[in-house]
A protein has these predicted regions:
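Reductase modules of NAD(P)H-dependent flavoproteins
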Residues: 2-11, 147, 152-249
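Short, flexible hinge/linker loops that cap or flank conserved catalytic cores
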Residues: 108-111, 138, 209-211
């Protein structure tokens, strides 16, 4: 999730960049030192800043981890990017401001045994935190179905983590990635499902035998995707929760 803010507070706490990794030319994971007493519920977001420009980012790490993991998409300066170009210049040891409290209501609702998570690229982040925490706490009684859409296969940054969990915890996780540009040369080696994630959701619901009586549906990412998913699952009487964002700047 991203929310634009102009920071007028000169006394915000800061935290340190522990490490970073560029996944593609415009996708980066940044690990920050978690401030003391910084608590959050999986699915929530933190607000960080540089040079008095702030944005909110969903947290990928679990609360038990000693760092905050953020997955960020770059918007170049010539496309109007303001904060993300600064985040791309960060090095290990650099400082960013951080608001002292995490926020957000896009968190796990445990009423239903089946949890259907729909996301696009960085919209997958809240689900990473939720699942890591669920496993860490040795919880049982729920199964998570993740449908992730992207234009290109290299945008599936957490796919290896999900596939490993499918093997080690088949009773817990089912992961379905899909690409929307199968004819692009960048996807020439892709042999998985194709189509926009919002266009395959009904077929996936049917093939997985999910029903409104036992399944909660979540969607995070592109607003257009969310609107379409919401309309389709609401028409089928599923309970639905959303987290909207578009490209940060």
């Amino acid at each position: 999730m991203t929310i634009q803010k102009l920071n007028k507070n000169n006394h915000l706490p800061t935290t340190t960049v522990i490490d970073y990794e560029n996944k593609t030319d415009d996708l980066r994971i940044i690990w920050l030192k978690k401030p003391a007493n910084f608590d959050f519920t999986p699915g929530q977001y933190c607000t960080i800043g540089k040079n008095k420009i702030e944005r909110a980012y969903s947290i990928a790490s679990s609360p038990h981890e000693e760092f905050l993991e953020l997955f960020i998409e770059l918007v170049p300066e010539n496309d109007g990017g303001v904060l993300t170009p600064q985040l791309w210049n960060l090095k290990t040891g650099d400082l960013v401001t951080i608001r002292p409290r995490a926020k957000g209501i896009f968190t796990l609702k445990e009423k239903h045994p089946n949890q259907l998570f729909v996301g696009t690229v960085t919209g997958i982040v809240p689900y990473v935190s939720i699942i890591r925490n669920y496993i860490h706490q040795n919880k049982i009684g729920h199964k998570f179905y993740i449908l992730e859409g992207a234009s290109y296969f290299d945008e599936f940054v957490y796919d290896n983590e999900f596939f490993k969990l499918m093997k080690s915890h088949p009773e817990l996780l089912h992961f379905v990635p899909t690409i929307s540009r199968p004819d692009d040369i960048k996807n020439s080696y892709w042999n998985g499902i194709t189509g926009r994630v919002n266009n395959i959701i009904v077929d996936q619901i049917n093939s997985l035998n999910l029903s409104p009586s036992n399944t909660m549906v979540y969607a995070c990412g592109h607003p257009g995707m969310i609107e379409d998913v919401k309309a389709k699952v609401s028409n089928l009487s599923f309970e639905f929760l959303e987290e909207r964002f578009w490209k940060d700047d």
